Structures are given as structure tokens and as C-alpha cells.
Amino acid sequence: MSRLNQILKDYPLLEATTSEIESMESSLADDVITSNDDEIQSVSPQYYLRDMFKASITEGPDDDFPPVPEVENDIILDDDEEYDGYKVDFAEARPWTALTQKNIDGRMNLELMAPENLTDAQYKQWVESVSSIMTISRQIRLHQAEIMDTSSGLLIIENMIPSIGRTSEFKSIPEHIPPSPTSDHTTPPSSLRSDTPSQTSSSSMGLPDVSSASDWSGMINKKIRIPPVVSSKSPYEFTLSDLYGSNQAALDYLSGSGMDLRTAVCSGLKQRGIYNRIRIQYKITPEFV
């Protein structure tokens, strides 16, 4: 130890070195005191570019963009009017109409407007009623029927002379059973036949007389052809049975009516709701094939 002390004494820069060490200790002590006064923050590794440029990120206005002018709104909206901009404008409700006819692409469209303020159950009942009327329209002439009010609804009364083998009671409509093939050839009594010839007789068209039901029964399954308005189209072919829905329906409608072939075809087309469509594309001059 004595030798170490001797060496240190003989060191020529001992005083300068000691002074430098003391200065470093004093500077280090000042840094420690200053860091204790500041808030201690955890230092994380600078992995991302945003951490390396924190000094350039400020919350002040961006000088690269022009200032946005403030819009003055002198109109003060009420609470009810504040959200008008977000409301959906619906089309104005149309007044109630029972039936609207439209012709779209040559096809007749009938729009039935449902009664107002119906519940879901009542709406379904209304749809079923309309469907039932469409179904029974093949059996009776609704355009000649009478409508009467009853305590439960409406009563539709057929206004025509029924043929033999056909029941037109209203209560039996939902349980209608298609007739057997033998009923298609039922010959009605002579009291139901019409002896008055039509204005356009079938004989003038080269056809047998069709004034009686017995004659119609032999023609309802014969092919009928009507020519197109445009020659490039094919003729339209059908039978009276197809037109009226069944042999029995055609026989019931035509028996005792005194119709000629053209009138019978026009009536069938109207019942099926395709008369306007057909008369635009075809000439209503029917003839048996």
C-alpha cells in the first residue's frame, strides 16, 4: 500500500486527474437531481418510423391545406325538424279504387286494391274470396249475375236458364266435382233449345247449325283456328273445351244461347281475360280445322 501511495505521489498528472474526476462526479450529480424533478417516462425501443419523428407530429393546423370556411346557418330547427334530412319520402298514397286495368306487353293486367285497414287474417280472407270467384267464373256467367247484400256478406245469384245435369246453388260451389265424361253428351229437353237462328248463321260459313246444345256437344272438342294479323305469325289454334275450361263448362255456356261460332269464341276469350291480347295479334274470324 505504501508503494502504491508512493507511485501516486510521483504521478505528474495526479492533481489534474483528480480535479477532472471530481468535475465529472459533480456533473453526474446535477443530472441525477434534474432527472428526479422531471416526470419519469418509460423508454421503449424505437422500432417504428412514427417513433423516430415524434417531434414533427403536432396537433396544430396543417399549413398544407387551406382553412375550411365556416358555414353560417341562421335557421334554427326545431326538434321535430332537425332530422328531416334523414327521412325517406314515400309516394303519396293513391285513393282506393276497386279495379285498375293495364295493358302490358299485349297482356291485360287487372289490379285489385285491397280494402283499407285490413288485418293480416282479413287480407287472406279477401284473397281467398277473389280466388274463389275466379274459379267459379268458368261455371257461371258472372257478368249476368245479380249481387245482393246479406248479413254475412254478398250473395251472387245466377241470372240464366241452367241446363240439365248442372247445379248452380251457391253453397255447393266449393265442393264442385268435375262431371263424368258421359255428362258431356247429355241432351237437354227440347224446351231448353233455341229455335231462333242467329244473325250470322253457321250454314253461311259452311258449318252445321250450332243453335242447339246437342250440336255444340259435337263441336266443343274440334280444333278452331284464327289467322294472325301479321302473316309471319302462326295461326292460333284451340278448342272450345280449352277456351271454357272443360267440356261441361263449354256446353253449359253455349247451350240454348243461339250464338254463332265467332260470338262463342269472343265470349270464351273474354272469360279467360285474353280477348284484348288476342284481338291485337289475331283476326277474330274463327273456322274449324
From Swiss-Prot:
Residues 182-204 have a biased composition (Low complexity). It comes from the Viruses. Keywords: Chaperone, Host cytoplasm, Phosphoprotein, Viral RNA replication, Virion. Signal peptide: none annotated. Homodimer. Interacts with the L polymerase; the association of P and L forms the polymerase complex and positions P optimally for encapsidation of newly synthesized genomes with the nucleoprotein. Interacts (via N-terminus) with N(0). Interacts (via C-terminus) with N in ribonucleocapsid (via C-terminus); this interaction allows to package the L polymerase in the virion and positions the polymerase on the template, since P acts as a bridge between N and L. It is found in: Virion; Host cytoplasm. One of its GO terms (cellular component) is host cell cytoplasm. InterPro entries: Phosphoprotein_C_viral (IPR043036), Phosphoprotein_central (IPR037263). The keyword Chaperone applies. This is Phosphoprotein. Nonenzymatic cofactor regulating the function and conformation of the RNA polymerase and part of the transcription and replication complex. Binds the viral ribonucleocapsid and positions the L polymerase on the template. Acts as a chaperone for newly synthesized free N protein, so-called N(0). Plays a role in virion assembly. GO terms for molecular function: RNA-directed RNA polymerase activity. The modification Phosphotyrosine is found at residue 11. The record marks 126 as: Involved in oligomerization. The N-terminus is disordered and is involved in binding N(0). The region of interaction with the L polymerase is necessary for transcription. The hinge region is highly variable. The central domain is involved in oligomerization. The C-terminus is basic and essential for binding the N-RNA template. Residues 170-211 are annotated as: Disordered. The modification Phosphoserine is found at residue 246. Belongs to the vesiculovirus protein P family. It comes from Isfahan virus. The record marks 270 as: Interaction with the Nucleoprotein-RNA.
